[in-house]
Amino acid sequence: MPRSRINGNFIDKTSSIVANILLRIIPTTSGEKEAFTYYRDGMSAQSEGNYAEALQNYYEAMRLEIDPYDRSYILYNIGLIHTSNGEHTKALEYYFRALERNPFLPQAFNNMAVICHYRGEQAIRQGDSEIAEAWSDQAAEYWKQAIALTPGNYIEAHNWLKITRRFE
């Protein structure tokens, strides 16, 4: 039974019903419908913290999905899981891949900036100010891109850029 049919709460059930109706009425190929089903099941598993199951669904969705824009969101969600698991190098790889297909994902730029900022903080704790500065500069570049795409969002990042004199 697809995961979408076993969701427990009202909102999940409603979303699943709407998604199933859309899948029936929107003219798509069976492969696209199957890819969307795997993607939807991946999001459901991810929201429940079942990351291994979510990854399986996302990888299957990637195998079937041909649209670059849709693939960007699958890749982004895979990046989120790797971020949650502390696998920052893998997460960055998936965020990059998502942005190659869709350069208008401010959340990917933000998450990349957060990882770089975290690595900069780690370098400071280890006493390596040169490496810390490089990571912080990279974080600044990613945050600038996120802010440029969605002005008014990422207020804390905007303030950090001003405080550290990295905002142009």
Swiss-Prot record:
Membrane-protein topology = Peripheral membrane protein
Q: Which UniProt keywords apply?
A: Chloroplast, Membrane, Photosynthesis, Plastid, Repeat, Thylakoid, TPR repeat
Q: What does this protein do?
A: Essential for the assembly of the photosystem I (PSI) complex. May act as a chaperone-like factor to guide the assembly of the PSI subunits.
Q: Which gene encodes it?
A: ycf3
Official protein name in the record: Photosystem I assembly protein Ycf3
Sorted alphabetically, the Gene Ontology cellular component annotations on this record are:
chloroplast thylakoid membrane
Family classification: Belongs to the Ycf3 family.
Question: Which InterPro entries does the record associate with it?
Answer: PSI_Ycf3_assembly (IPR022818), TPR-like_helical_dom_sf (IPR011990), TPR_rpt (IPR019734), Ycf3/AcsC/BcsC/TPR_MFPF (IPR051685)
Q: List, alphabetically, the PANTHER family matched.
A: CELLULOSE SYNTHASE OPERON PROTEIN C, TPR REPEAT-CONTAINING PROTEIN MJ0263
Q: Does the keyword Plastid apply?
A: yes
Each TPR repeat, start to end: 35-68, 72-105, 120-153
Subcellular location, record wording? Plastid, Chloroplast thylakoid membrane
Q: GO annotations under biological process?
A: photosynthesis
Q: Which organism is it from?
A: Drimys granadensis
